[in-house]
Amino acid sequence: MSEEIQLVGEKNELGESISPQLPSEVKNFLIDIDGTITDDVPNEEPERMVTCLPYPDALETMAKWYDEGHVLTFFTSRTEEHREVTEIWLKKHSIKYHGLLMGKPRGGNYHWIDNHIVRATRFE
């Protein structure tokens, strides 16, 4: 489920954005799935991916962010073989989003290195 995001920035001769940027008021959220918006379901138990329920507060918050025009991309440790069940689950629970990235390495020792400020939030 993806919606076109309006980007700002200079255009090339074809009218395409060069190094596109989000407007300053738009946040770009990168959200984990398991243990963050639903119970922690390991890849070894894919049958639970179908039946787990999203956390109500997470549903409300993500819907608000999406409706406010922010970008929601899920970044999950689920593998590509879990993509279809994950997309079905997101649709079943009416979770709107812009992108789904699979294959995040498991573990909690994440470091994001960028030339811009990166803000990390623990979603509780």
Predicted regions and their residues:
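HAD-like aspartate-dependent phosphatase fold
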Residues: 1-124
